[in-house]
């Protein structure tokens, strides 16, 4: 995947984690540190919103495992109304995140977007359904960040 990004005129890496969603713009394979930030848009906010609305509107006590099962398309015992609510709120979460990125002058329609992090894996269907991401790539390895840091460490250590 690194070779793919090196040949792209413009790419954005979006890491959707528990507490934050981080992004980094890459131009011609090089990080543009003037266009990177950490947004307080992690999936824990989504879990809390789903649990709150589920309790208020449907008198349900959903936990994170329930939400994960619904969002990953696993068979659950929940009625269609619960599944619809969870998927609707997840789609709104993704739409809001991408609107925030657009406000920061990142138009995802015309670039490669690499999605990493557990939140990106969880929300893959909603990200793909958004329909305004030019070329989405998903890193499904939950340990990709650690592997990347290990790679950078080895490069740094070899240079000493």
Role assignments for model-derived ranges:
Residues 2-8, 43-160:
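Helical "lid/coupling" subdomains associated with nucleotide-phosphate turnover
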Residues 15, 37, 140:
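Conserved acidic E/D residue at the C-terminus of a beta-strand in Rossmann-like folds
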Residues 2-31, 50:
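Gly/Thr-rich phosphate-binding beta-strand-loop-beta motif of the actin/hexokinase/Hsp70
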Residues 28-41, 134:
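Short helix/strand-bridging catalytic loops that position acidic/His residues to coordinate divalent metals
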Residues 13, 38, 113-115:
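Short glycine- and Lys/Arg-enriched binding-loop motifs that mark or flank ligand-binding interfaces
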Residues 14, 41-44:
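Aspartyl protease active-site motif detector
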């Amino acid at each position: 995947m690194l070779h793919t990004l090196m040949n792209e005129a413009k790419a954005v890496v979006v890491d959707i984690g528990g507490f934050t969603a981080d992004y980094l713009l890459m131009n011609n394979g090089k990080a543009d540190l003037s266009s990177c930030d950490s947004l307080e848009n992690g999936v824990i906010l989504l879990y809390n919103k789903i649990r709150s609305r589920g309790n208020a509107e449907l008198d349900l006590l959903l936990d994170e495992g329930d939400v994960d099962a619904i969002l990953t398309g696993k068979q659950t015992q929940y009625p269609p109304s619960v599944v619809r609510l969870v998927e609707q709120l997840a789609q709104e979460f993704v739409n809001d995140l991408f609107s925030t990125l657009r406000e920061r002058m990142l138009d995802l329609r015309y670039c490669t977007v690499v999605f990493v992090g557990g939140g990106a894996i969880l929300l893959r269907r909603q990200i793909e359904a958004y329909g305004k991401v030019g070329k989405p790539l998903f890193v499904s390895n939950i340990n990709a960040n650690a592997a990347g840091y290990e790679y950078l460490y080895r490069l740094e250590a070899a240079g000493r």
